[in-house]
Amino acid sequence: KIKVAIKPCDLSRVFAASGGLPLAKRAPQRQAYRLIELQRWSDFLQVPMHVQPQFFPVTPDPAARLIIAAQIAHGNEVALNLSTAIMRAMWSEQKNIADEATLIGIACDADLDGKQLVKSAETSAVQGDYDSNTNDAIAANVFGAPWYVYKGEGFWGQDRLDFLENAFLAK
């Protein structure tokens, strides 16, 4: 059994350190192709998705800190489930994941104390973990998300999961 440890980080800092560009600064061809790829992945995975959600781009910091607060309070599995719920809220349900009331609702729907979790997410300890995760990502040469590390080797993107699985099986 493989344990997945989620480490939310500030992608704007990761992009700045790795030469990546935020979506709005990418060439029009890349922006257009991204929409095609998002629809392909939505169809392939049979996951409903708005490829241009109403609230995107949006600052991910409050949601990232909420996930870290959940991880501290309830463990990694709860944090992973909350992360999935937050992504679904943005990409499928067109919710604003930078909005405090929205985040409280998402957490409550996941059987968590949303108000307490949002309060915890605003602490210096959680911000410290967020900054540490970001610094660790930069030090590990992360340049995008999702990013997986197995035995010190990085794998970028959901389309690399087969390679990650092969690495698990190679032992």
Ranges and model annotations:
Residues 1-7, 72, 81, 85-171:
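C-terminal cap of thioredoxin/glutaredoxin-like
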